[in-house]
């Protein structure tokens, strides 16, 4: 039984921190990956996702991104002049058949999705570990809401369930 989406969206920044720019090539998976990146992935990082993913879609506004020098049949590039998540998701659906996608990113990208009201379901896993500091990213980073009138900029979702995982 499939328990996860077959499309995963991540940021190049987080993936670079996880070491994809220096990792050896992985085995192919049935999951397709979308990476939003302007300058964090190098050629090895791009090839890593070409090896890993059924389909690899890079979204970038960088005309000199290393992905443009890679020739792999499963590599697709969406070039944007500026970030438009709504347009990118529409293109993922129309051009690549992406109906559902899991977004696993940092607070800055999460903030953009939230402010464009593009979340329709959220799974939050909270690990029993406390990490902090004023420079530590949070679940939603980005520009702060400054007034009550700005609450309309974010969507409200209904809590469906709260489940404690084993060994947590």
Where are these regions (language model features)?
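Enzymes that bind and transform nitrogen-containing heteroaromatic metabolites
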Residues: 1-168
């Amino acid at each position: 039984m499939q328990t996860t989406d077959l499309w995963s969206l991540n940021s190049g920044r987080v993936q670079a921190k996880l070491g994809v720019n220096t990792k050896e090539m992985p085995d192919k998976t049935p999951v397709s990956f979308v990476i939003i990146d302007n300058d964090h992935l190098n050629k090895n990082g791009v090839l890593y996702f070409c090896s890993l993913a059924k389909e690899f879609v890079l979204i970038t506004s960088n005309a000199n991104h290393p992905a443009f020098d890679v020739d792999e049949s499963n590599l697709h590039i969406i070039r944007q002049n500026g970030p438009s998540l709504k347009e990118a998701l529409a293109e993922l659906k129309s051009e690549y058949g992406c109906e559902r996608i899991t977004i696993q990113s940092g607070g800055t990208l999460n903030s953009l999705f939230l402010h464009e009201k593009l979340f329709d379901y959220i799974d939050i896993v909270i690990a029993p570990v406390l990490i902090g500091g004023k420079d530590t990213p949070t679940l939603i980073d980005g520009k702060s809401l400054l007034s009550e009138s700005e609450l309309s900029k974010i969507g409200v979702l209904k809590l469906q369930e709260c489940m404690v995982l084993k060994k947590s």
